[in-house]
UniProtKB/Swiss-Prot annotation:
Gene that specifies this protein: HXK3
Cellular component annotations (GO), alphabetically ordered: mitochondrial outer membrane; mitochondrion
Superkingdom of this protein's organism: Eukaryota
Family: Belongs to the hexokinase family.
EC number: 2.7.1.1
Record-annotated Hexokinase domain positions: 35-494
Membrane topology: Single-pass membrane protein
Induction: Induced by treatment with 1-aminocyclopropanecarboxylate (ACC) and zeatin. Repressed by treatment with abscisic acid (ABA).
Function: Fructose and glucose phosphorylating enzyme. May be involved in the phosphorylation of glucose during the export from mitochondrion to cytosol. Plays a role in plant growth and development, perhaps by mediating cross-talk between glucose and hormone response pathways. Involved in root hair cell development by mediating certain aspects of cross talk between glucose and ethylene response pathways.
Amino-acid positions noted as binding ADP in the UniProt annotation, renumbered to this chain: 104-105, 252, 448
Lineage of producing organism: Eukaryota, Viridiplantae, Streptophyta, Embryophyta, Tracheophyta
Gene3D superfamilies reported in the protein's UniProt record: 3.30.420.40, 3.40.367.20
Name under which the protein is recorded: Hexokinase-3
Taxonomic source organism: Arabidopsis thaliana
Amino acid sequence: MGKVAVAFAAVAVVAACSVAAVMVGRRMKSRRKWRTVVEILKELEDDCDTPVGRLRQVVDAMAVEMHAGLASEGGSKLKMLLTFVDDLPTGREKGTYYALHLGGTYFRILRVLLGDQRSYLDVQDVERHPIPSHLMNSTSEVLFNFLAFSLERFIEKEENGSDSQGVRRELAFTFSFPVKHTSISSGVLIKWTKGFEISEMVGQDIAECLQGALNRRGLDMHVAALVNDTVGALSLGYYHDPDTVVAVVFGTGSNACYLERTDAIIKCQGLLTTSGSMVVNMEWGNFWSSHLPRTSYDIDLDAESSNANDMGFEKMISGMYLGDIVRRVILRMSEDSDIFGPISPVLSEPYVLRTNSVSAIHEDDTPELQEVARILKDIGVSDVPLKVRKLVVKICDVVTRRAGRLAAAGIAGILKKIGRDGSGGITSGRSRSEIQMQKRTVVAVEGGLYMNYTMFREYMEEALVEILGEEVSQYVVVKAMEDGSSIGSALLVASLQS
């Protein structure tokens, strides 16, 4: 019996050792997998790093590209388009005006009532609708017939039995895509962005397309202005505060415009305006510089997009793309380890993770990160532990921090070009005394990314102070302009009628 007992004991010891070895092996394997994802995160942090020195290099590059774009057509990746807006609303406008805004995700219709004092601005009957996805690759006729029909329904609700037939309505068409203007009320489409792909429209006059659709429906409505969304935001900002000289949109896409002296627009020598200035639409989404911190995820996203090698800056800072950058990081971690469980087919779908979900993940303050868990479940990643949820929050933070800080560098680049960054910048003939006298400068900002994503907004504003320094940044005011592009465009039409 003694020998049997010894044998059993030996077997038990061997079994225990085997179990222990398996457990140790599993722990080591788990640690290796965790170490793998930590290394991926560290690589992402390094590649997205935006120290203030690097940001100032981006600022300088932006200012140089602006100068080149004003000097000659095709001289820069920045198109620096003339808008033919040389007078902005003063607050003395009055009347009733309409605006239709076609953006990247939504279209809006609104009516604005103006008194003859700046304090009387009544925005009525705002309608906001998602753009049906089938319209984005339909035809010119289908798209504009849909917009005209939407305007017709809006007018019918407004009339509601009232006798307003025979009244011609003045309409501002806010169009968030690159247009080469021939006047304030006409311009041809240069290219589509933000996922639209109606190739037959490139080179067509956008205002004429809409006016034709309105005429076909028998609507007595006149397209009085064709306005980029940034120009609309600048218009509303200037209406409230004449120190507004820059406007930026951070939404599905991103763009900026600013008030430039006509003598600095070298490619249009002899351009005369009563104000001596004109609003320039930069189309800054296509800006590029070797100083931009690009990752392998950015490269893959660009290569697989419908506009490869185009809109490089926009793809790093705008709402259409931030979610997909985060998705690509999570997918790589899933492929290199199993901390997210089996790879979900949903996770492999481009753009399945939206930037509004990234915002919700980033700003989840529940102890167990319940919102993070819910959103991960929606993309096929279920039952991950808290430390993995925290990892996802960190990914969102890294990607968003880079976006916000690069956005700030873009704004600072504009301020440098017009001599409002404290350095004098590319001054285009300004005297030394003008350079040294720092002026109050208002930057109007609009767009869902800025308005709704708190951390993006905070990172952008924090970086702007870092770049400019405390002394100069106290003269720079960033103002949110909700629905500014639509309201401001209506104000521009009003100023034309005054």
